[in-house]
Amino acid sequence: MLIFIVLIIIGMSGCEKVAVDNQASGDVFVKAIKDASGTTVYTAIHSVFSYNQMTTVTVQTPEGLTESLNGYDSNGNSFFNEPAESDFVGVPPTPGAYVYTVKFANNETKTYSNTLSVATLQPALITSLVKSANGDSVYIAWNAIASTDAYQLKISRGTTQVYYQPAFQDGSTPLKANLKLGLSKSALTSGVTGTYTFELTGLLFENSNYDYLQAISTSTKDIDL
């Protein structure tokens, strides 16, 4: 049995913007993928969120290196880094305190920090991605990731996202070694044929509040529908 849970990344909950003092929250976590040779490689992901408008955000690593983060949109509420394939390397990023310097729209500057531990997640082994015998459903199966707290699933056709399942958990007792999720083919494709990419991500949180991430891992597999 898979249990779906509510996920709030960055730990700042609320339904509306309120005029308050400038505040932001930063998160650093490890992302792991498999490269073309099948080797697990890693990089650091940074995300900073605020209900107040931010104009610039930089992060300083434990080694003293500084990197500028990109704004998600023109609203200035979210900044992040978007790693290239070359940013993934064979060893996890340096653990320790990552310091975020945030400049807000009124020119006020504040700093925040988040600590990265040594914990990582291995990418899931997707064991099968198949259509049902009658062709009306698609099933993805994978080996459970040790130590993961939850999973999420994104499905795309080319650059178009067609499905997103927020964080869900295995609610079985004991936990299953292998997991399976079925989806309606018609709901995914809306009659459009093509190659669909299933992106399965494991999530490891810093604590049981599910507010800050510690590590994620991503696996992908394609199917023609």
PLM segments and residue spans:
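Short, solvent-exposed loop/linker segments at the N-terminal edge
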Residues: 32-38, 130-136
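Post-signal-peptide N-terminal segment of Sec-exported extracytoplasmic proteins
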Residues: 34-68
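Proline-enriched interdomain boundary motifs that mark the N-terminal boundary
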Residues: 24-27, 120-130
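Conserved aromatic anchor
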Residues: 46-48, 136-148
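Bacterial Sec-dependent N-terminal signal peptides
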Residues: 7-37, 225
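Short beta-strand elements
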Residues: 111-122, 208-225
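Recognizes extended acidic, P/S/T-rich segments that occur
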Residues: 59-88, 152-191
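Beta-strand-rich modules
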Residues: 102-104, 186-217
